A protein has these predicted regions:
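Membrane-embedded translocation segments of transport machinery
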Residues: 2-6, 169, 173-321, 325, ...
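C-terminal membrane-solvent junction of multi-pass transporters and transport-like membrane proteins
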Residues: 88, 339-351, 382-442
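Loop-to-transmembrane helix boundary motifs in multi-pass membrane proteins
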Residues: 5, 11-13, 19, 146-147, ...
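Membrane-interface "cap" regions at the ends of multi-pass membrane proteins
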Residues: 1-27, 56-61, 65-87, 246-250, ...
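Transmembrane helix-boundary motif of multi-pass solute transporters/channels
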Residues: 11-48, 236-242, 253-256, 260-261
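Helix-loop-helix connectors at the membrane interface of multi-pass transporters/channels
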Residues: 3, 107-140, 244-248, 253, ...
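Inter-helical loop and helix-membrane interface segments of multi-pass membrane transporters/permeases
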Residues: 3-4, 32-36, 66-91, 104-165, ...
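Membrane-water interface regions at transmembrane-helix termini and the short interhelical loops
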Residues: 32-36, 84-100, 136-140, 151-175, ...
Length: 451
C-alpha cells in the first residue's frame, strides 16, 4: 500500500505545530514566564528550545522520514539485525493511550465552557463566586464530564477516519489558521484594557526582582522543562509526521518553524491573560484554576464578556483538539502499520477503546475521588505523571541514543537524513554535544520530575 503523505508543506507545519500547541501553552507558560523574571525567562526558554527541543525534534522526524513507518516499524526498519530498539515503539503507543485518557477529558471541559458562554449560562448578572464555583459543579457531575469527553473522542476519530489529507490535514489547517486569528483578536482586545501596561510589565519586562525572589535555579529548571515538554517529544507523536513529509526541506529548518509557531501561541496567550488579570485585580495562577476559575469571572465582568469568553474557549478548543487529532493519527498509524488493518477498522477499535479509557479520569473527580493510584495523586495527575515525568523524557532519551550512538542507527545516518533537502543544516561538529551533553540534560529533566 502506498504511504500517505501531506498535500503541502504548510499542512505538515500546521499539523506538527498543532500537536505541539496545547493546553500547557496557555495555562503554564505565561505564569512561569511572569514568575521567573519575564523577558529573562523568555530569552532562556528560547535558548533551551534551540539547544534541547529542536535537536530532539529533528531526531523524531528523521526516524519517521528515513523509515516511512510509524513508531514500532520505524525502529525495525532502521535498527541493526537482532537489536531490540523497536520495543520502545510499543511504549510510544502506551504513552499515546495514556495521554488521551486524560487529554480528552480536559478538552471536554473546554467544550463545556464554550457552551456555557455561548448559551448565556455564564452572564453578567452572576457573581464572581457563582462563576468560579461552576468548575467544581462540573467536576462533581460524571454525566456531564463523560458526555463532553466522548464528544471529543467521537469528533477526533471521525476526522481521522477521512484519512491524512482529507481528514487530519484539511481540518487542522482550518483550525490552526482560525486559532492564529482568534489569538491575535483576543490579544489586541486585552491590550486595550486599563491594566494592560501593568500586566505586560509583569509578563515580559525583564525583572531581576522576580529572579531574586524565586531564585535563578527556578528560572533555569522551569525554562528547561517548558522547552522540553511543550513539543510532546518521546512518544512518537512527531515521528509519525516525519513519515508523511517530503525530502524537499532539511529537518532543522522545519523544526525551528514548528517551535516558532508553538512559542508564538504561548507568548500571545500571556498577552491575553495578564492584561485581563491586572485590569480586574485578579492574581494570575497556573493550571486548571487559571482557565476555569480565574478567567471566567474576568470575562463576565468586562464589556461584551460573553462574546470574549466564548472566543477564548473556542481558541482553547482549537489548541487542545489539534493535539487530540495528532495523537489519534499516531495511534491509528501504529495499528495500521503494525497489524496490517484498514484505517476504518483501526478507527472503530481505537474509538471504542479510548472512549472507555477516558472514563477513569472522569470518575476520578466524583465517584472515584478517593482513588489515588500514584503518590497520593488523583487519576488525572497520576496519568499525567506517567506520561510527563516518565514516558516523555525516557522516550526522548531513547530516540537521542538511537540516532547518535553507533550501537543504534548511528550519527552519520541521522545527519545525512536531517540535512537532506534545502534549508538549515546541522554541522557534524555537533556530534560530541549530541552524544554527551544532550543526554545529560535529558537525564537531569527526568530526575527533576521524579524527585
Amino acid at each position: 500500500m502506498k504511504r500517505e503523505s501531506f498535500r503541502s508543506r504548510l499542512g505538515f507545519l500546521l499539523v506538527s505545530a498543532g500537536c505541539a500547541i496545547g493546553i500547557g501553552n496557555v495555562w503554564r507558560f505565561p505564569y512561569i514566564a511572569g514568575k521567573n523574571g519575564g523577558g529573562y525567562f523568555v530569552l532562556f526558554y528560547l535558548l533551551c528550545l534551540l539547544v534541547m527541543g529542536v535537536p530532539v525534534l529533528t531526531m523524531e522526524l528523521a526516524v519517521g522520514r528515513a523509515s516511512r513507518r510509524s513508531a514500532v516499524l520505524s525502529y525495525k526498519t532502521l535498527e541493526k539485525p537482532g537489536q531490540k530498539w523497536h520495543i520502545h515503539g510499543w511504549f510510544c503507543l502506551l504513552g499515546c493511550y495514556l495521554l488521551m485518557m486524560y487529554y480528552t477529558t480536559v478538552s471536554g471541559w473546554m467544550v463545556s465552557y464554550f457552551g456555557k458562554f455561548l448559551t448565556g449560562a455564564f452572564h453578567s448578572g452572576m457573581s464572581t463566586d457563582e462563576v468560579a464555583s461552576a468548575f467544581g459543579a462540573m467536576l462533581s457531575s460524571p454525566g456531564e464530564m463523560a458526555l463532553w469527553a466522548e464528544v471529543v473522542v467521537v469528533a477526533g476519530f471521525l476526522v481521522c477516519s477521512f484519512g491524512l489529507q482529507k481528514g487530519l490535514e484539511r481540518v487542522t489547517k482550518v483550525m490552526m489558521l482560525c486559532l492564529l486569528v482568534l489569538i491575535l483578536v483576543l490579544a489586541v482586545h486585552s491590550l486595550t484594557l486599563s491594566g494592560a501596561a501593568e500586566g505586560m510589565k509583569f509578563y515580559l519586562v525583564p525583572s531581576m526582582d522576580s529572579i531574586r525572589e524565586n531564585g535563578f535555579g527556578s528560572l533555569v529548571t522551569d525554562a528547561m522543562n517548558q522547552a522540553f515538554f511543550t513539543l510532546s517529544l518521546g512518544i512518537a507523536a512527531m515521528e509519525i509526521f516525519g513519515s508523511y513529509m517530503s525530502d524537499e526541506h532539511t529537518l532543522p529548518g522545519e523544526a525551528v518553524r514548528i517551535c516558532a509557531l508553538d512559542t508564538f501561541v504561548a507568548l500571545m496567550a500571556g498577552t491575553i491573560i495578564f492584561p485581563a488579570c491586572f485590569t480586574f485585580g485578579v492574581a494570575p495562577e497556573e493550571g486548571p484554576a487559571l482557565i476555569f476559575q480565574t478567567l471566567p469571572p474576568v470575562f463576565i465582568n468586562m464589556a461584551g464578556g460573553r462574546f470574549w469568553g466564548a472566543l477564548f474557549f473556542l481558541f482553547m478548543i482549537f489548541a487542545s483538539f489539534s493535539t487530540v487529532l495528532a495523537v489519534f493519527e499516531n495511534i491509528l498509524a501504529i495499528c495500521m502499520d503494525t497489524f496490517g488493518i484498514s484505517r476504518r477498522k483501526a478507527v472503530l477499535i481505537n474509538g471504542i477503546l479510548i472512549a472507555a479509557l477516558s472514563l477513569p479520569c472522569v470518575f476520578g473527580y466524583n465517584i472515584w475521588s478517593d482513588f489515588r493510584p500514584i503518590l497520593g495523586k488523583d487519576v488525572l495527575d497520576s496519568e499525567d505523571f506517567l506520561v510527563s515525568n516518565l514516558l516523555l523524557p525516557i522516550g526522548s532519551l531513547v530516540y537521542l541514543l538511537f540516532c547518535v550512538m553507533k550501537w543504534g542507527w548511528g550519527f552519520d545516518k541521522y545527519l545525512a537524513e536531517v540535512n537532506k533537502g534545502t534549508g538549515i543544516k546541522l554541522s557534524p561538529k555537533l556530534k560530541p554535544y549530541f552524544q554527551w551533553v544532550l543526554p545529560i540534560l535529558i537525564v537531569i529533566i527526568l530526575l527533576q520530575g521524579l524527585l
